[in-house]
A protein has these predicted regions:
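Generic hydrophobic alpha-helical scaffold/packing signal
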Residues: 19, 65, 89, 162-166
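C-terminal or mid-to-C-terminal helical accessory/interaction module adjacent to the motor/catalytic core
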Residues: 99-169
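Phosphate-handling DNA/RNA-contact segment within nucleic-acid enzymes
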Residues: 1-67, 71, 84-85
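Aromatic side chains
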Residues: 1, 6, 13-16, 34, ...
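Catalytic cores of large soluble enzymes that bind and process phosphate-bearing ligands
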Residues: 3-10, 52, 56, 76-84, ...
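Conserved catalytic cores of soluble enzyme domains
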Residues: 23, 54-109, 115-121
């Protein structure tokens, strides 16, 4: 339960244990679950954390940006993972600055960070290294199934992106 001392939507699993690795690598990997964090730490990715609760919030991002300006979200490649990534991305738009680098990676084949890092830590490292920048993720998501040679699709794209651009400080 939440209280005056504990606000779940602002806490991150593994942050205390990750601080040294985050400082050394100047990067934070954010995953969806606690078991992912445990496996990643065991497999050499001590700079990983997970949000407590059900979703990543602006409060989480504000806290993490104190430790590194390089944030990598790592989600499952399924529909739920893409939805979680979109929500995280929109939360990031209000907080990013010129010196902030946010990127998104997705694990395919029905695996999660726990499984992939246990089976092949180098493959997990590649997933993180090949992350999409926030802008690439944003544009790829909005342009999916659109043809900008068609005026109707240009209109859809413009209507979709303008509210997001307005979130950026």
């Amino acid at each position: 339960p939440e209280s005056d001392l504990f606000y779940k939507s602002a806490e991150l699993y593994g942050l205390y244990e990750s601080k040294q690795d985050i400082s050394k690598k100047d990067q934070i990997i954010i995953v969806e679950g606690y078991t992912d964090v445990v496996a990643l730490h065991k497999n050499g990715f001590g700079n990983s954390v997970a949000a407590l609760g059900t979703a990543f919030t602006k409060l989480h991002l504000t806290k993490l940006l104190r430790y590194s300006k390089n944030i990598v979200f790592c989600f499952d490649g399924d529909v739920a993972g893409k939805k979680a990534a979109w929500k995280a991305m929109t939360n990031c738009l209000t907080e990013i600055r010129d010196d902030t680098n946010v990127s998104f990676s997705f694990i395919q084949d029905g695996k999660d960070p726990d499984e992939l890092s246990n089976q092949d830590p180098n493959a997990f490292k590649d997933v993180i290294s090949n992350s999409l920048t926030l802008s690439d993720f944003l544009f790829d998501s909005l342009l999916k199934n659109l043809n900008l040679n068609k005026i109707e699709d240009k209109t859809k794209f413009t209507r979709s992106i303008l509210p997001l651009i307005q979130l950026i400080p």
